[in-house]
Amino acid sequence: MSQSVSPGIPEASSPGILHGWWPNPIFRRYVRSRLRPQALVVWLLLTLVVASFLFFMPRTLALYQGRMPIADAERMPIFFIMGLQAVILFIFGTGNVAAGVTAEADEGTLDYQRLSPLTPLRKVMGYLLGLPIREWLMFAVTLPFTAWALWRGEIVASTWMPVYAVLISSAVLYHLTGLVAGTVVKNRRWAFLVSIIVIILLYTVIPQAAKFGLVYFKYLTLWPVLDEHMLEFLPRTIRGPAHLASLLTDKPDARFFGLNLPEAVFTIFSQAVLSLTFIMILWRRWRKAEAHMLGKVWALGLFAWMQLLLLGNALPLIGSGDLFPARQIARRYGAQMMAEPQIGEALAMIGLYGLVTMVLLIVLILIITPAVDDQVRGLRRARKLGWKRVPWISDAASSLGFTAAMALLGGIGWTVFAQQIIGSDWFRGHQLAAWTGPVFVMVLLGAGLCCQTVLEARGGRTLFLVCIFLGVVPVLTGGVLGMVSKASLTPAAWLMGISPVSAPFYAAATMVPTTGFDDTFSLTIPTAFRFWQGITVLSAVWLVVLLRQQHRARRESVLGPVDLFTKCASGTSAPVPPSGLKDRG
Amino acid sequence: MRIRCAPGGSFLTVMTPATPAAVPAIQINDLRVDYGGFVAVDDVSLSVPPGEIFGLVGPNGAGKTSTFRVLATLMEPTYGEVKLAGIDIFEQPENARRVIGYMPDLAPVPSDLKVWEFLDLFAESHGLGTGPERMARIGECLTQVSLLEKSGVFCKTLSRGQTQRLVLAKTLLHRPRVLILDEPASGMDPLSRRQLRLALRNLAADGATIIVSSHILSELAEMCTSLCVMNRGKLLASGTVDEVRKALGRAERTLTLGVLERAEEAAAMLGRRDHVTGISLAGERLVFQFAGTHREQAQLVTALVQEGFLIHTLEEQKSTFEEILVEVAESGNTIPSLPPLPKP
């Protein structure tokens, strides 16, 4: 680095290639701080050593112990190296993104970035690509090993390109997840932990739901594409067993309603939509630090889109039976046992769809519901501007209407899913009750409104306690009670029925009359479901009435006992807003 | 300079006759900031013309930092309008940020960057030309705050005062037209403070408007061309130090008079004069409060001499600005004496 007359200041600030290729100040800031030679050399050497080991060990074993042909032996290290790349990008990269942005918030230097005239999008991109720059270089160090294995292993580009495209898009998605976690969580250590937990949940645990009909979730991971191309990566000499070959070759394309898409294309598309949502969250936060993560309309749109994706991926697989776990198991083990989908698994899948929809609904309610302070601020602003009420899409407005709209959409999606499954050829002897739609909507509406009203009126802490004591404790206690004896199954079913978590499964069991199950299942669960849903609906109505009373009281406490807005509307005493006052709600 | 203040509406304007037609550098209308039930800034209106060094004074919790954070586009108020150099900061935040230089209280610096790297990050964000041009500007700013020799060291190795100076250099980088400095002198040694004062005066002379808060009030009084006192979210008074003192009803000072003979008679005579209160007698020394002008004070002394009193000393003692602020903070926040001012 050349020195100018000023000690320590270089004559120009573009000492490296990475500094120059993208003129984003935040990116360049991290290129400087995270690529300092001392630390970088250590990390790159470490990566080189591990990658070398993972490359040479399986290759040598295959070549000298397995006596494989050279082209086959060269293929052996590919998955090991890919695993290392995944660890570097997914775990180290994401953790550093989350911790890095929280560190800035912790130090207080994030405010400087808020003050800079860069657009929110440039800031987001700067952090997204700058914070994990060292991990991307470490990834680059492993690429020669991959390139060698692909070249000498004679793996064609159409095999490895989709896999690496999805690997990179997954990494970007995970980094965005880390960035969101780091931006939302205030504590540096928690940000790291939360980002890792969110990633494990989003991209490891939740995708397991794909095995039970929620196929969309698997497209958030690398697995579908890897599954699709697994066989071409494996050495030809170990593709032996016929059922393994059929398992690996007989893969359907990604189905979205009537469309057949390559797995890679649909995966990248699915991840892009989620990435866009994360970018929207970050954009809102950079634009206004106090803003909700998502606006109300965006949340409603996202919810509808998720329903569309869940249905679009699942419905085309019903006819062939590929949606059902029994068929998947049969395929995996090459056996014919349990090849026919069972009504029990259909009920479980319908219940799970309802539960996932309910969880998504509650997550979005948590995002869009204003805190009491926000509501008061919104009222004050409205009063100042002489408005009749807070604009309905502003962050400060009640989320009651949007909760109801999302519950309605979720109920419709859930009903369509259940109708398509039960109405399929696999379950000819079964029929969905006529009032399934309204009941499903009621289940989601009851849980959603209770959650929303408690959150809006009493805050997150009260909601947390309610969730623990009404959502979790009854399920756990009922589970333990059910283990005692057969006689205790009935009280256990009643107890578990208190929890909204069990409601979707109880609803599925109630709406699809079945035979062949014992009395607990066929009699107790529907009765318990009707009773507890009745209680839930009454509670929801009562809470909504209370919330509206609280809204009125709050409006009067903020605006005074006289309703200025009514007067304003009638023209008797219109408060004139000072010129130039703007709303930014 | 004229000062106007409406006690109820918390409206203040500082008007400099030299620039009557200029667009105010800082224009705040009906600004309110709430934190839950706590009103941090209560319907404040304020107008500061270009070239002023405007001090914002008040005890902790007065609402200074909240006001500064709103001005710096870091916080959204409950409502209100803010224009900096004619730019609405809520409508055009990116444009507003080009004219703002903000230095927060206890200004932090990143631990993983060197001094020049820290400055280059913001020089580039503000689009200050090519690499060499930016480096030249960084050199200028570091020279201005006497940190040039530290440009190659990591920010985390700087002392508190050096960190403050570095952040000041960062604030000055893009030649902002409105400087918002929250406690800029905290942690600085006396020499650095003097440099800061000089730097701010030079900037103001070049047309920049500076709004600054400090707990070192005497220093603020020296530095600022005008002051404004804030307490419990409301603006109380504005003007020069003396004008503010007067506006706050603290224009009176303590006079001590040394009289050789007939001290009791002199006390009786003082008791009959206007503007005189709280007379106490200790031997030959008469101590009393006087709220009149200096001319009236001279007339008082002349009258005493004409009555034949032998005066050998006259000492004047003004209450310090700190004392006034302590009183303001403890006593409440209304100023009954000033006439209401119509809002623009």
Question: Locations of the language-model features?
Answer:
Chain B
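C-terminal coupling/interaction segments
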Residues: 11, 16, 292-344
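ABC transporter nucleotide-binding domains
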Residues: 23-26, 33-212, 217-231, 236-237
